[in-house]
Amino acid sequence: MRVPEIYHPHPAPPYRALPHPLATIRAGISGFPSPAEDYVGRTLDLNERLVKRPSATFFMTVTGDSMVDFGIQDGDTLVVDRSIDARPGHIVVALVDGEVIVKRYEMIGKRPYLCSGNSRYTPIPVADLDCQVWGVVRSVIHEYPV
Amino acid sequence: MIGLVDCNNFYVSCERVFQPRLEGVPVGVMSNNDGCVIARSNELKALGVEMGTPAFELQQWVNQGRIHLLSSNYELYGDMSARVREVLEEFSAGVEPYSIDEMFVLFDGFDAATTRQLARTLYRNVRQFTGIPVCVGVAPTRTLAKLANRAAKKLPEYGGTCVIPADGAETRRLLERTALGDVWGVGRRLVERLALQGIETAWDLRQADPKAIRRRFSVTLERTVRELQGMPCIELNDADRPRDRIMTSRSFGRHTGDLGELQEAIRQHAQRGAEKLRRQDSLARAILVFLKTNCHRSDLPQYSPSVVVELPEPTDDSRPILAAAHQGLEAIYRRGYQFMKGGVMLFDLVDANRQQLSLLDTPERAAQRDRDHQLMAALDELNQKMGHGTVRLGMPSQNAAWHLRCAHRTPRWTTNWLELPKGAT
């Protein structure tokens, strides 16, 4: 039986760990061992670096060009963490009138706004909208064609 | 104390996390193969749509845009269920999944105020972290925790969490308001028989003499009485309970990371589960396969995955169940981990006698089903007479594709790179 492919439900363990470069740095010339030596032989795991809380982390694909000044481009993958309470300055995924949008949450004067990273779009005042934060963007993954 | 965390309208809630437009409107989830409703939002319940309603009866409402019907997306539900479990595990080492959307959480060693606070935190965090709304009931026994959970869900004054002690005015009031049929493990036939004795509410049953109940009814019901009195005596996989899901799992004799050994263990569990399914005249729609490493060995790498595989159609036939278990195991297995425990859960059960036949059903398929039925009956009889494992099925090889009808399945938002949700900038 083959139901459409099954993907690993949750990449909790390091799926593909990379070898850590050997630490060759010495602390000064005194010969005391460097703290970095404790990590010799460890491997690096991108999940561990990017996904702080797996249960609350979701990936999302970006559409549109309104966030390019914040380094978020059409087609990029966002790492969204729902366990963080949104504060001004965070890039958030918000539900606005039933749509899912990505903006920067800012306070202008004493009023909250959703701002774009593109001068062609003006800030949207939140007060007049049915708006809810879905999650906070922790990082963006941009893959280059190679 | 034992907490029960129950996800509200779980399948519909999973869909709503990624489709905010489904919020507040009637939504149903359909089984993919037999085309009937297997999950409903509150709005759909309010329209009088029952579980098991065939999709074609609702087609007109769908066309009018009054309701939304979605195909089931078990991959999504399995992933969201694992996330809920993970959030709970941040608070308690004792989390026992009871079904895909219900989990018992052990709350030991807290005073009453802390317990209440913890229940609120679980309620809030699961909702925030995963997007799934839940209710939390906490009490000294599983039966009372179930009852508290029901109160948390149905009675607005509790606001989603309800903590009750073994005794006291509040516990009494709740038990008095709970009909017998809503007590865990009390089926319809028992309700009728108990009514003849003048026992009509959970409180009446609690007041009954456990020994007399044992004589007149069963040990199982006696345990329910004691549980209602606040004395824990039901284990999670109590064999005598009628089930809405079948769990078979066990710790391995020793740690193992060998795929062959794991396959053998999962095969046994799946076959045992299928036998239990046939004994209680149920069919399953889906199977969950899980593995666990030893969480007490922090020196070893930890990995406790689970996955849900949908069965090609509701079935009690060991062969497709084994095939699905095998496929699930392959999907979650990773080398380099020492597993300590594994098992399967068969869920979304339907009554075998009330099974809706697929629209695609043909006389040939009906005849095939009869033959399958006889084969399974023969298998069970042999195993019963000659001892377990006399006749066993091997793990099937991957072959024939099954045709799934899942035209309305939503994307696998969390488990497929090509189907991630979109965020417009």
For every predicted segment, state its role.
Chain A
Residues 79-80, 93:
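Hydrophobic beta-strand signal
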